[in-house]
Amino acid sequence: MIFIFISFLSLFFKWQRLMFILISLEFIVMSLFILFSGDLNEMMFFYFMCFSVVSSVLGMVVMVGNVKFYGSDLCLF
């Protein structure tokens, strides 16, 4: 439960930067993954795991796509 609280606080206070949004969403998915791992049956667990992997990959694609345009994601690399 502490991961959900920290990730929602991070999402609430640092919503202007794409990197922090992606990190917050990953922490939310990780905490939900830990929370629901014992309650879901095998098929729903597989679906949730695939959904979390696809959302992570799409988030990385969006971040790399934004890094091409310098400064559009408010990050300096």
Curated annotation (Swiss-Prot):
Claim: rRNA-binding is one of the keywords in the record: no
Topology in membrane: Multi-pass membrane protein
Protein localization: Mitochondrion membrane
Catalytic activity reported: a ubiquinone + NADH + 5 H(+)(in) = a ubiquinol + NAD(+) + 4 H(+)(out)
Enzyme Commission number, as recorded: 7.1.1.2
A GO term from the CC aspect: mitochondrial membrane
Membrane-spanning parts: 18-38, 44-64
An example Gene Ontology molecular-function term: NADH dehydrogenase (ubiquinone) activity
Keyword Cell membrane found: no
Keywords: Electron transport, Membrane, Mitochondrion, NAD, Respiratory chain, Translocase, Transmembrane, Transmembrane helix, Transport, Ubiquinone
Function: Core subunit of the mitochondrial membrane respiratory chain NADH dehydrogenase (Complex I) that is believed to belong to the minimal assembly required for catalysis. Complex I functions in the transfer of electrons from NADH to the respiratory chain. The immediate electron acceptor for the enzyme is believed to be ubiquinone.
Stated family: Belongs to the complex I subunit 4L family.
Protein known as: NADH-ubiquinone oxidoreductase chain 4L
Biological source species: Ascaris suum (Pig roundworm)
